[in-house]
Amino acid sequence: MNQETTWFGQPRGLTVLFLTNMWEQFSYFGMRALLVYYMTKQLLIGQAQSSFIYGTYTAMAYFTPIVGGVIADRYLGKRKAVIIGASIMALGHFMMAFEALFFFALAAIALGNGLFLPSLPSQVGDLYKRDDPRRGWAFNIYYVGINIGGFLAPLICGTLGELYGWHYGFGAAGIGMVAGLIIYLAGQKHLPPEQPRRPAANDQAREGFNRHTILLLLGVGLSVTVFRAAYEQIGNTVALWADSGVDRAAGTFQIPMTWFQSLNPLFVMLLTPPLLAYWRRHAHKETQGSLVRRMALGSLIVGSAYLLLAAVTATTGEALAGWVWLALFFLVLTFGELFILPTGLGLFARLAPPHLGATTVASWFLVIFSGSLTAGLVGTLWSSFEPSGYFLLLAAFAAVAALLLRGISSVADPETKG
């Protein structure tokens, strides 16, 4: 393993994984920024059905990694799984340029994602020894890569799709996926060696796991499922509100509706460095319990962001809300997100046995699957509520998740169980 350090004092392989992930996320967020608008404005699918399709697609994109992680660990290996998965996803993104292939394209992206998604972040963990303190910070750096791609995608894919034609936006997303694949192939020598594949050994499957660890992961997973029912609305019903309920005029310029999807990843990039610096100074106090408490605080902050939207929509009534309120919402939501999502992914990777890295990370994506599916169902309620009441409901979901996580944190450390 190449231990030469570069950016942020991390192994060179992290740069390869960071850039690969960045371009994959560019393709994902580029397509996501267009998806609900494409269905309602181009395919003329109703709002409730479009929200459900959106939620089902995002859910399936995170369900397939459950199987894909097992396939990567037992049969293909992580590198081959990433290459095959990225190739299938690129094909799916290009298929999105053709209306007749819409549902086939969504299926291809979800299937390719199943191989790609658990295999790439689990290689981040493989770059380090299990007791290396840089391991946890690496996932926050990796998370910035997600959000650089997420920031650029709505500006490029969204602008092309909204102003020049939906299919140009989808095509740009496909090009991003190809760029990520090329970077991954070119950087193979810097990646961690493959862990030995150990098919079907039940005793090995149990190695490294105990009852306390399993219950901890289940409890955190359930809590994050509830949280994501609210969080995932940023690309669904919040995006619809940005189109219909927000005054997007900035002087004489009309801000494209897809551009607001760039605010979340932009704020991630701005807020991550100071938060990382703070957490690094307090790393010596870090325990499993403190990580779960951090997640609880994050969920509470996200709930306050939705409370802000509830107050704004209740105050404005039928009038359009100023776009500054939407920007402030994304700032508060993103601050809370950084406390919960990268921390949760890092916790799952931290507790994973070495030979089950992709499988354990895949279980984190099972959490995202269940949360996205719940979010799709919650999204169908948008037309049945006043915006203020709907955003209040989302705040309640985030608050419940915070309470669950706070309760779990008290028994999260092995020495405190029982």
Give the ranges of each region predicted by the language model.
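Transmembrane alpha-helices of Major Facilitator/SLC transporters
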Residues: 253-283, 298-306
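Short amphipathic helix-loop junctions that connect adjacent transmembrane helices
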Residues: 33-49, 234-260
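Conserved MFS/SLC helix-loop-helix module at the cytosolic interface between two early adjacent transmembrane helices
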Residues: 65-97
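Hydrophobic core of transmembrane alpha-helices in multi-pass small-molecule transporters
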Residues: 22, 92, 101-116, 318-339
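Central cavity-lining transmembrane alpha-helices of secondary-active solute carriers
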Residues: 55-72, 117, 262-275
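Intracellular loop-helix junctions on the cytosolic face of multi-pass helical membrane proteins
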Residues: 1-12, 129-133, 157-253, 275, ...
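Glycine-rich segments within core transmembrane alpha-helices of 12-TM secondary carriers
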Residues: 61, 134-162, 169-180, 184, ...
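C-terminal ends and interior cores of transmembrane alpha-helices
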Residues: 84-104, 297-318
